[in-house]
């Protein structure tokens, strides 16, 4: 009996049969959705009822009121750190005025989540989508303090819908993922595996080109074309952020105050970074390491496809591998990056619950430790508290384990059918 089988046994003993049956009904998921979202709405009401915002939405509100002309920023953080389509939800949230900015921002994300849940639990997934939907709600309970206050909350449900339909409608998925990439870059880590695994990869590629052309045209017409690629360079000189996986050695050097190592704020980009022997070299190397990791993942995907891997499983596990690599080999490592993994796991669980329950458990552990880090005890962490350093280290180790799992399973997809005739590419 596996660990997960034991959990099911415990659940059956603890919960009455009627309760278990209720959780298996499609309607129960919507009740759960309402409870989770009403909780976060109530919590955020303590801010927006006073005309305040929470976390990054304060920066978004400032951009929405000040505009997007870099010449008018006067040393402030540039809004062009995000791809240009992020401007749409950022400005839309100001439609009811600055005092209700947080409320409108929350409602936008809640609406997108509702659409994502609808697609997850309709048609052929009316039954198989229920358990993944509950997993999503529990994940949101831990990550909601981040997802309802970050652009990631906008992109995550869009990526989920794209993954749910990538097998049967890859071009539609390509369009959705391309749009999401122009809001926040990370969906590109999902678009690449979908393109590799799809029989319609050429059409998927040109759907992305078409979206990019429309975005470029719109940006040119609005007078911002000169800044359309600023998001690729605006943060290029930043150091190793505290939460990044590869920052872990300097976190502990800071805890024990070895060789002048420390954690300090980078006020220019509003982040906390680690400083110490070799930290600058590590920051310089992270970009090429990330590129190499992405190339290695792409090669592994192509290899598996040529050996007859099942396409839907390939782009799902490939997406998990690529997105996790984007996090592990990233010198930023912000807590909200964990949100990126949610849509991939949810789509994977809907495709094959048994195969995906291990990474789902790993990600839930990552979400729990991230919740302890932010919003609960971020201040002790930036003051080098050893207990919080241990929590962060645990989170980072779990991320590495998740990356290892995804690489291993993707490689296995390529080995299972070595005798099969290669698929038409």
Task: Map each language-model feature to its residues.
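Alpha-helical transmembrane segments and terminal signal-anchor/GPI-anchor hydrophobic tails
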Residues: 225-259, 281, 332-337
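Multi-pass membrane glycosyltransferase architecture that uses lipid-linked
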Residues: 2-233, 284-425
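Short hydrophobic/aromatic helix or loop-helix immediately within or flanking a transmembrane segment
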Residues: 62-65, 76-99, 240-278
């Amino acid at each position: 009996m596996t660990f997960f089988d034991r959990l099911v046994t415990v659940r059956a003993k603890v919960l009455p049969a009627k309760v278990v049956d209720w959780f298996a009904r499609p309607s129960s998921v919507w009740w759960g959705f309402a409870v989770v979202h009403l909780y976060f709405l109530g919590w955020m009401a303590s801010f927006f009822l006073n005309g305040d915002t929470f976390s990054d939405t304060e920066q978004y509100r400032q951009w929405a009121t000040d505009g997007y002309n870099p010449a008018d920023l006067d040393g402030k953080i540039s809004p062009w750190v995000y791809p240009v389509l992020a401007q749409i939800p950022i400005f839309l949230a100001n439609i009811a005025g600055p005092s209700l900015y947080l409320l409108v921002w929350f409602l936008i994300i809640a609406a997108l989540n509702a659409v994502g849940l609808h697609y997850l639990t309709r048609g052929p997934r009316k039954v198989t989508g229920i358990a993944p939907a509950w997993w999503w709600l529990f994940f949101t309970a831990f990550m909601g303090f981040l997802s309802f206050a970050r652009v990631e909350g906008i992109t995550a449900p869009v990526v989920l819908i794209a993954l749910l339909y990538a097998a049967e409608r890859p071009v539609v998925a390509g369009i959705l993922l391309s749009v999401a990439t122009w809001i926040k870059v990370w969906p590109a880590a999902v678009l690449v595996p979908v393109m590799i695994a799809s029989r319609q990869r050429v059409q998927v590629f040109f759907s992305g080109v078409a979206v990019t052309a429309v975005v470029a045209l719109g940006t040119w017409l609005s007078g911002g074309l000169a800044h359309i690629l600023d998001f690729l360079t605006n943060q290029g000189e930043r150091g190793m952020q505290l939460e990044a996986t590869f920052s872990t050695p300097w976190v502990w050097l800071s805890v024990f105050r070895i060789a002048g190592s420390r954690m300090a704020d980078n006020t220019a980009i509003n982040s906390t970074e680690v400083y110490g022997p070799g930290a600058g070299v590590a920051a310089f190397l992270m970009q090429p390491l990330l590129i190499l990791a992405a190339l290695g993942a792409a090669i592994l995907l192509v290899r598996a496809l040529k050996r007859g891997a099942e396409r839907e499983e390939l782009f799902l596990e490939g997406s998990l591998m690529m997105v996790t690599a984007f996090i592990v080999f990233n010198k930023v490592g912000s807590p909200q990056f964990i949100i990126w993994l949610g849509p991939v796991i949810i789509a994977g669980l809907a495709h094959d619950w048994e195969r995906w329950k291990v990474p789902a458990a790993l990600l839930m552990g990552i979400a729990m430790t991230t919740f302890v880090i932010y919003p609960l005890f971020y201040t002790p962490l930036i003051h080098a508290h050893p207990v919080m350093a241990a929590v962060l280290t645990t989170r980072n180790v779990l991320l590495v384990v998740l990356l290892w799992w995804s690489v291993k399973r993707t490689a296995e997809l390529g080995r299972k059918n070595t005798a099969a005739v290669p698929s038409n590419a």
